[in-house]
């Protein structure tokens, strides 16, 4: 049976400032930690990325032409405050006013994120969100943006608090490149959630007309053997690290006893302690019912088995299938069942995980209000022929995920939109330019855009709401 989506459903495309804009030092923009980190550690940089800084009118015209009625955009904090606070960069402010005006002109609703992996270097080198001073700087930055950009109707505080902590302090593929420090992972998550809560409360107290929420990456975790209590425990602990800790902070305003038992076990095995203060929980409690929406970024699920050896994580950055490894002492090891397909980057394709995660939020956090799927898509080594890409694999991937959204809505979940990652091809943090996700192919040499087969398919779905 052909499935459908609601008439008012948003069919969006997602971008991020650092991955799309280029112009990393243009018009007064301050440095971010990624600038030097990429130069020192990788074979690529974020120059010029997709040159969105100059070519956004082209991308928004394409969005309008192809039925994309929402766009995720992030503001580069260091374009507004080059050092993270203090002096405002007028040219950066002007750029975003112009960008948002173009969105509205093209009838593409901007969903605007304040922080998408790109803390200004001056604050990042001072501890990033492990340093509580930077909570204050973030709230001040948020307050400035809320007041300066009344044309924005949908705000997101952070994109993927979980992967920021993981990338910086667990996997070590984000600056500062620290590995296996789980105390820092949890502390980063916590301090960013406090920052989120304070920004949300401020937004509501000021009476702004728009909506505000947060975007969490929520990869669903399953036990490899559901009959084996040790595998079940491994999946629960892995879920606490990546999902439950931040969801509790968002919607409970505290960490449940079950969550803290898991956190304490992980820290007992791996070392470290947390600084959780009374005023933090006052802030979390005050904001728990103020979130207008939850953004869920979903790409994959993981299966866990019990594991007691030493921690080792190997990141597959070049698309060499089977080269990744993930095992955490006292938590578990990721082992995918044979029956689930995976991408060249070892990302497991499992749409059921998106359905299960949505229904989990609905059940465990009934104060969630509504959900947008703020990122979902397939990273591919696209083959450019005949001025297009015949990306049937991407179409199939998105179709399967839209179908489970239709199921979730039918089963009572309030899901209001879907943003494909990504609108056009962009630069990928730890994979460079080989891994493409866009509806529109970008020739990074010429910066020309070409609609892929998926763009034509997505347009039809957006126009008819029929998933075919």
Swiss-Prot record:
UniProt-listed Enzyme Commission number(s): 3.2.1.85
Signal peptide range in chain numbering: none
Enzymatic class: hydrolase
Catalysed transformations (reactions): a 6-phospho-beta-D-galactoside + H2O = D-galactose 6-phosphate + an alcohol
Keyword terms, alphabetized: Glycosidase, Hydrolase
Binding site for D-galactose 6-phosphate: 19, 116, 159-160, 297, 428-429, 435, 437
A GO BP entry: lactose catabolic process via tagatose-6-phosphate
Entry annotation: catalytic residues: 160, 375
GO molecular function: 6-phospho-beta-galactosidase activity; beta-glucosidase activity
Residues passing through the membrane, by range: none
Cellular component aspect of the GO annotation: cytosol
Gene3D superfamilies: Glycosidases
Pfam families hit by this protein: Glyco_hydro_1
PROSITE patterns: GLYCOSYL_HYDROL_F1_1, GLYCOSYL_HYDROL_F1_2
Pathway of action: Carbohydrate metabolism; lactose degradation; D-galactose 6-phosphate and beta-D-glucose from lactose 6-phosphate: step 1/1
Family according to the record: Belongs to the glycosyl hydrolase 1 family.
PANTHER family reported for this sequence: GLYCOSYL HYDROLASE, LP05116P
Protein name, UniProt field: 6-phospho-beta-galactosidase 2
Taxon lineage: Bacteria, Bacillati, Bacillota, Bacilli, Lactobacillales
Gene: lacG2
């Amino acid at each position: 049976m052909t499935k459908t989506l609601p008439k008012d459903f948003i069919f969006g495309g997602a971008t991020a400032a650092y991955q799309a804009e280029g112009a990393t030092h243009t018009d007064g923009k301050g440095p971010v930690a990624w600038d030097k980190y990429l130069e020192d550690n990788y074979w690529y940089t974020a120059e010029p990325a997709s040159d969105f800084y100059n070519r956004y009118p082209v991308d928004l015209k394409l969005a309008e032409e192809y039925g994309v009625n929402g766009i995720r955009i992030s503001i580069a904090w260091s374009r507004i405050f080059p050092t993270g606070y203090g002096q405002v960069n007028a040219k950066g402010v002007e750029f975003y006013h112009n960008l948002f005006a173009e969105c509205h002109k093209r009838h593409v609703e901007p969903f605007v994120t304040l922080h998408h992996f790109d803390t200004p270097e001056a604050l990042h080198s001072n501890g990033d969100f492990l340093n509580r001073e930077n909570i204050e700087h973030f709230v001040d930055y948020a307050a400035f943006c809320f007041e300066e950009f009344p044309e924005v109707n949908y705000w997101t505080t952070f994109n993927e608090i979980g992967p920021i902590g993981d990338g910086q302090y667990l996997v070590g593929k984000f600056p500062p490149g620290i590995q296996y420090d789980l105390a820092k992972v949890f502390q980063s998550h916590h301090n960013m959630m406090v920052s989120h809560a304070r920004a949300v409360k401020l937004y509501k107290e000021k009476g702004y007309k728009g909506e505000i929420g947060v975007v969490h990456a929520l990869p669903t975790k399953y036990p490899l053997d559901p009959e084996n209590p040790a595998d079940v425990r491994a999946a629960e602990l892995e879920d606490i690290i990546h999902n439950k800790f931040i969801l509790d902070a968002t919607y409970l305003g505290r960490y449940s006893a079950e969550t803290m038992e898991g956190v304490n076990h992980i820290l007992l095995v791996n070392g470290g302690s947390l600084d959780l203060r009374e005023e933090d929980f006052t802030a979390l409690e005050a904001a728990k019912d103020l979130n207008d929406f939850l953004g869920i970024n979903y790409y994959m699920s993981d299966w866990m088995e019990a594991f007691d050896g030493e921690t080792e994580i190997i990141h597959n950055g070049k698309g060499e299938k089977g080269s990744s490894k993930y095992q955490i002492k006292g938590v578990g090891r990721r082992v995918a069942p044979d029956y689930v397909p995976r991408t060249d980057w070892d990302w497991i394709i499992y749409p059921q995980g998106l359905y299960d995660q949505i229904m989990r939020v609905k059940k465990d956090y009934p104060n969630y209000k509504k959900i947008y799927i703020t990122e979902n898509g397939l990273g591919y080594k696209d083959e450019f022929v005949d001025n297009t890409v015949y990306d049937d694999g991407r179409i199939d991937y998105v179709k399967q995920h839209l179908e489970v959204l239709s199921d979730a809505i039918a089963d009572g979940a309030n899901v209001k939109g879907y943003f494909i990652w990504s609108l056009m091809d962009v630069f990928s943090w730890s994979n460079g330019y080989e891994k493409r996700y866009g509806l529109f192919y970008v020739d990074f040499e010429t910066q020309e855009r070409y609609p892929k087969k998926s763009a034509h398919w997505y347009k039809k779905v957006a126009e008819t709401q029929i998933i075919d």
